[in-house]
Amino acid sequence: MSLIHRYQNNGYNIVLDINSGCIHVVDEVTYEVLPYMEEGLDTAAIVGKLGDQFSEEDIKTSVAECEKLKADGMLFTRDVYENAIDTFTKNRQTVVKALCLHIAHDCNLACRYCFAEEGEYHGRRALMSFKVGKKALDFLIANSGSRHNLEVDFFGGEPLMNWQVVKDLVAYGREQEKIHNKKFRFTLTTNGVLLNDEVMEFCNKEMGNVVLSIDGRKEVHDFMRPFRKGAGSYDLIFPKFQKFAESRNQDKYYVRGTFTHHNLDFSQDVLHLADLGFKQISVEPVVADPSEEYALREEDLPKIMEEYDLLAKEMIKREKEGKGFKFFHFMIDLTGGPCVYKRLSGCGSGTEYLAVTPWGDFYPCHQFVGEEEYLMGNVDEGITRPDIQKEFGCCNVYTKPACKDCFARFYCSGGCAANGYHAHKDIRSNYEIGCELQRKRVECAIMIKAALAED
């Protein structure tokens, strides 16, 4: 298993020291020297290998500099985390930090790619009652231990179809904060159909983040996100989303889209949203059954990779022109970020994070809702399947065979358990197309950092 990852992008020779996280932008000599150093060749042998390409002096200088970086723990560092994560997993006390409240298993759109089947999640249409939501918040408080900051996402379906209950639960949460010394961060995901000034005003006061669903260009959005009778939704929601983003000072929100086989030129959708003034953008690859006509295929990968490269270059250009924006999948923290245990074990689904259905059932996350083998309990009885919690708690990059040799493992934390389950019926497996795209996004994100660091 290599300890470094080398790649070339946009004219940069980039070397990632996988286990330390150090990034090196190197010259041609060093780029070619490094593989031989990792093989264990000495300076003389490397000169013999590369002497017809570079001068002996340049090769010796490069080797000496790399040896210094190695001695300083910045190159060819070893993985010291496998035993540590095992100990951490066995000894940590699980606390619940976040809930995804399915406030509405109903929707007013009929999006073609919806994993929730128009909000029904393979079941019945339903709205969460205040009573069930209250019990969910009580469960979160009771199972959060000493943790002060808690998160609750209002999700659907379409949450605004049950707006009064959203408001009532926020009010209840604020009351409980004072009693239990907790702080709730509420978030909301909406398709915008029912968005109005009253909703915006409430969200700007109470919601730490809002996710606004829009796929990009009008023709793309209207094809994938129509009303049930077939009409498009772009013209209705777009001006409302613009107003909402401005009312939040272009912060603490995302416009979030999905690209599919039908719009492989998705960089144009990202740039369309940026041109309309949005500063916080996420356009993500669809995850779908391969039989769906909109599903991404292996043969789509070269085009998708090309699009990520195009987008990265355009983002650098716009940033230098003072017209920059954030793209969620290119956001990477090279100086701080989560602790190593978080980076190795992922999002916390099934342990620190749970989804709650309208009738109060617990699942590991929203993408497992309806999968009865992963029904974990309910708001009345609590967790009745601790074995599921344990199964998810033991899920990390070292228990996923495909992750052990992947250079991006400290950035993706092993990927999405639901994607692995839906691809191979195993939460420790990986969705291969998703892994390929994740690696590409990490490469682009690092390249952007390198390019902007030059100025």
Enumerate the predicted regions with their spans:
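C-terminal accessory region of radical SAM enzymes
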Residues: 302-336, 366-413
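Short acidic, hydrophobic short linear motifs in intrinsically disordered regions
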Residues: 40-51
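Cysteine-cluster motifs in flexible loop/terminal segments that predominantly coordinate metals
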Residues: 394-444
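Radical SAM enzyme [4Fe-4S]-AdoMet core and its adjacent flexible, acidic
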Residues: 219, 223-235, 242, 246-349, ...
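Short Fe-S-cluster ligation motifs
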Residues: 137-155, 392-394, 429-455
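Acidic, low-complexity/disordered tracts enriched in E/D and polar residues
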Residues: 1-37
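Conserved alpha-helical substructure of the radical SAM core
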Residues: 53-54, 60-61, 65-72, 76-79, ...
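Radical SAM/AdoMet-radical enzyme domain recognition
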Residues: 133, 137-153, 162-286
